[in-house]
A protein has these predicted regions:
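Short acidic-glycine loop/turn motifs at beta-strand connectors
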Residues: 96-99
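Glycine-rich, aromatic-bearing surface loops/beta-hairpins
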Residues: 124, 137, 143-153
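Aromatic side chains
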Residues: 31-34, 105, 121-124
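A surface-exposed partner-binding patch
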Residues: 1-94, 142, 150-162
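Intrinsically disordered, low-complexity regulatory segments enriched in Ser/Thr/Pro
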Residues: 101-109
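Compact, glycine/acidic-enriched structural inserts
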Residues: 109-137
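Non-membrane alpha-helical secondary structure
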Residues: 56, 113, 117, 144-148
């Protein structure tokens, strides 16, 4: 892993088992290994590539005890999939155990367009690169406008209550 993690702790086995029971499957080995010491960790500023035109960063890894409730906020994810990280701008990274624990990107604006990021959680962690916001140099006039979906604030309020 190329980035530092802060504030994580070992997950309780009972919380891992409760999630596995709710999902009806075992959590992938690479994710379980991560949970042994980094449950709920916050990574240093980072970036990962979604596709040739887009990138994102992980804000926090979701504590295993909260995953099942957070899963209810995601539309169109497979039955044995579950969110493991909050990505920037209200998006998520999730794992799908029906696909051998592969990691996917879920975009709240395009929930039907799920993007595969890596074949496993461990491989996803290897995609995370340190990021320094000072490395971004915008040219005058480069940003013409920005837009936020009107329902986004309501989504965040609903999400934070769970």
């Amino acid at each position: 892993m190329k980035i530092k993690l802060n504030g994580g702790k070992p997950a309780l086995e009972q919380d891992c088992v409760a999630l596995e029971t709710a999902l009806g499957c075992r959590l992938s080995d690479s994710y379980r290994a991560f949970l042994r010491s980094h449950d709920g960790a916050r990574p240093e500023n980072n970036i990962f590539k979604i596709n040739d035109k887009n990138s994102c960063g992980v804000n926090d890894f979701i504590p295993v005890k909260e995953i099942w409730n957070k899963r209810a906020c995601l539309e169109n994810i497979p039955p044995k999939a579950y969110p493991v990280a909050w990505a920037e701008c209200g998006n998520f990274v999730f794992l799908d155990e029906d696909r051998h624990g592969a990691a996917f990107f879920w975009d709240h604006e395009l929930p039907e367009e799920i993007v595969k990021l890596a074949p496993s959680f461990g491989a996803f962690l290897d995609l995370l690169e340190p990021f320094d916001v000072k490395s971004i140099k915008l040219k005058p006039g480069q940003v013409k406008n920005s837009w936020v979906h009107p329902d986004y604030v309501d989504f965040l309020k609903k999400f934070r209550k769970k």
